């Protein structure tokens, strides 16, 4: 709102530039083999949400099923270390999503699991993964709207919404609690 009015930032398809990374592999999630599914599950479990009071321990089924059953394809970008091509150092996923704003339905891609190896942070990996994924996606699709989830403090990007998450430790709850349903 402050610098650029709401709308599409880039109408033309992007070109490879200094942020494009050749070591990022762009994959349709439907085409992942069992080995890659295990790799991304382990990577997300080890390097996504590394906060003191939060722990995300996904299963392969919980990750892969998140991308099934959509009207369009879901995508994954994997960035490997330049000196050790078997070492995954960054990743990002996108899945199709329909949102309704002011009674207008928009088709977009929701960005999730943007994740960088703990030992590789603060090296500019995330922007390169994002740009390379964006470029590859735009050359495959006409859809040019991407929605990012931002965890932490608000930045210069104007948020669509702001909300709080709450965590509850249910491991010590002594009985099953039921809630009234309408």
Positions of the model-derived regions?
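An N-terminus-focused feature that recognizes amino-terminal "leader" regions
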Residues: 1-182
